[in-house]
Structure formats: structure tokens, C-alpha cells
A protein has these predicted regions:
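Sec-dependent signal peptide recognition
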Residues: 2-10
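C-terminal motif of bacterial Sec signal peptides marking the signal peptidase cleavage site
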Residues: 15-17
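Bacterial signal peptide processing site
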Residues: 19-21
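N-terminal (or domain-start) structured segment
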Residues: 24-86, 101
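Bilobed "Venus flytrap"/periplasmic-binding protein-like clamshell domains
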Residues: 28-55, 117-183, 295, 299-304
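Acidic, polar ligand-binding/catalytic clefts
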Residues: 80-116, 126, 194-198
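Pocket-lining segment of extracytoplasmic ligand-binding domains
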Residues: 87-89, 97-98, 163-255, 259-260
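Segments of small-molecule ligand-sensing domains
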Residues: 245-316
């Protein structure tokens, strides 16, 4: 372990080179974490905001945006340094053109694969929807077109031979979806959130709601086309009296930009793992972290993160 003086000396050197990607205000470097307030990644941003300044002299700010789909753009265009991005979204943004970019976002880099977020498919019991194939011809809420939830829902449907058009998609916030479900204006809704999710709990509080499982056979078909989706489950009883529900999950990647200084990203990565118990107290999904899997990024690792993982392997 380096001495405290050397630690801070190295961090000051690292941050001194952060003119473009890390904003300076009153000579104090600012690391911006992209987030949507009230959404699933906001608690992690708040937890990092508490911990990172204790390890190096920088101020962590939340860079607010209206849509989680903006995270990639904020990082790629230099308006944020860190964000939590779904692995499927990160891979698509890095390898191909997307709706907001005519060319791949090749400046994206991975820091750590952290935890899995389940996809929730909820339907009215009266709709007689029992599996994904029963969604054909139904009115299904996909939240916002272009959002990570819609992206994962679309990949899930395509994996079993359906398209979004097959399900008569409806675009609306989850809060509006609750009203539409009550009124019988829609039959089902795709949602995404770490369990227990306040939004999912609110939907499941509506009488007559049920989770629709996505079974192993369907997940195997989905993974054949979209390997970043995998099997996970919604624990029994956390939204009322329901059994454990099989579903699709997608991993969340802490991502950054390629021009962040190597030393800065090294210390961010190191701080993340040395402070993991504290972070997990503030953001329980981090308890899922598989320390043997954290570097399995679908896009290239940032050199600073790769340096941390190499050192970790050497000193284990």
C-alpha cells in the first residue's frame, strides 16, 4: 500500500492533466456522473459522490438528463465523465450507428461490470397473457422509444421472433401506464428496475396485476441473438404474494471516455472496489458484484481500469 502522501501526490498529478474531460471550477477538478434523478442509477451516483472525494481531491457532480438513453451521448460528447450504461446499449453504441449518432461511439470505454438489472413484464390477469408469445396483438407499454428499457424489451421480443410492431407499442411514463392499466387501455407493460423497485411496486399494487415469466427455453432463444441478455429472477414476495419469477436480466457497466487520464480512472476504479462495503450499504445492488467478472466489459476497458485489474491479479 502506498503512503498517503504519495497517494495524494499521484492523484494531483493525474487530475492536473484533466483540462478537457474533467472540468475545473475554482481549481478543484469536477468529475461529472450522468444520471436521471429518481431513476435506478441515481442512488449509485449519490453513493459515489459521497465516497470518491474522500480518496482524492475532486468534487463529484451529478450531470442531470431527462433520459437514460442520453448517458452515452453525454460521455461521448465530453459532457460527463462517468455513467452507468446497460451492457447491451454500450455494445450497440460502440459497434454501430444509433438513433442519435450516425457513426459508432468509439470513445466509450468500460470501467467495471457491476450488477444485473431485471426486466419486468407485467400484465392484467384478465388479458390472458402467460408468456412472451401471447403479447402478439396486445397493447404493450415500452416506456419511451429509444430508452434502455425499450431497447432491452425490443431485443427480448426479437429473440422469440416478435417485433415491437407486433405488440402495438404504447409510449408513456410508468406513472401513466398505471392509469392506463387501471382503465383497461393497455394490456401489459415492460419495466426495468433494481428489486425492490418503487415504480414496479406501484404497478403491482393495482388489483389484477401479474408478472409474466420469461422461461429458460425462451431465454436460450433470446441469448442466441443477443448474448448480453441472460437469465435472472425476481425474488418471491417482494411485490406482494407472488412466487419467484424467471426473467431476462441485463448487466450494468460503469463507463467512461477514452481520453480520461489513466491515473484518474485507475484511482476511480481502485476507490470503487476499496469502498465497496460502504457503497453497497447505500446502493444494495452492488452486493451482486462478481469480483471475477467485473472486467468482462463488452467494450474495451479504459487503460486505467485495466491497470487496476492487472495489479489486482498480481497481488492476489
Amino acid at each position: 500500500m502506498r503512503s498517503g502522501c504519495r497517494f495524494f501526490a499521484m492523484v494531483f498529478i493525474a487530475l492536473a492533466g484533466c483540462r478537457a474531460p474533467v472540468e475545473k471550477r475554482d481549481t478543484v477538478p469536477v468529475v461529472r456522473i450522468a444520471t436521471v434523478l429518481g431513476r435506478i442509477t441515481n442512488p449509485l451516483a449519490e453513493a459515489l459522490n459521497k465516497v470518491l472525494p474522500d480518496h482524492f481531491p475532486a468534487r463529484v457532480e451529478v450531470q442531470k438528463t431527462d433520459l437514460t438513453g442520453d448517458y452515452v451521448r453525454l460521455i461521448a460528447e465530453g459532457n460527463a465523465e462517468l455513467a452507468m450504461i446497460q451492457t447491451d446499449v454500450a455494445y450497440a453504441a460502440y459497434t454501430q450507428s444509433t438513433g442519435d449518432s450516425p457513426s459508432p461511439r468509439r470513445r466509450l470505454r468500460g470501467v467495471a461490470v457491476l450488477y444485473t438489472t431485471p426486466l419486468h413484464l407485467i400484465a392484467l390477469q384478465s388479458s390472458r397473457i402467460r408468456n412472451l408469445m401471447d403479447l402478439r396483438g396486445k397493447r404493450v407499454v415500452v416506456v419511451t422509444i429509444g430508452s434502455p428499457t425499450e431497447f432491452t424489451a425490443r431485443m427480448t421480443l426479437e429473440g422469440v421472433g416478435l417485433s415491437v410492431a407486433d405488440v402495438h407499442p404504447r409510449q408513456m411514463p410508468l406513472e401513466e401506464a398505471i392509469r392506463a392499466l387501471r382503465a383497461g387501455e393497455v394490456d401489459a407493460v415492460f419495466g426495468r428496475g433494481n428489486d425492490p423497485s418503487p415504480s414496479i411496486r406501484q404497478i403491482m399494487s393495482v388489483p389484477g396485476m401479474t408478472f409474466i415469466p420469461i422461461g429458460r427455453g425462451q431465454i436460450d432463444k433470446i441469448r442466441a441473438y443477443h448474448p448480453f441478455l441472460h437469465s435472472t429472477s425476481i425474488p418471491a414476495g417482494i411485490y406482494g404474494n407472488h412466487p419467484e419469477i424467471e426473467t431476462v436480466g441485463v448487466e450494468m457497466l460503469l463507463a467512461c471516455r477514452d481520453d480520461l487520464p489513466v491515473d484518474l480512472v485507475y484511482w476511480i476504479t481502485r476507490t470503487l472496489f476499496e469502498s465497496l462495503p460502504v457503497l453497497a450499504d447505500s446502493f444494495p445492488p452492488l452486493r451482486q458484484i462478481d469480483l471475477e467478472h467485473v472486467q468482462a466489459s463488452p467494450i474495451p476497458l479504459h487503460s486505467g481500469a485495466a491497470r487496476f485489474y492487472r495489479e489486482r491479479e498480481l497481488f492476489q
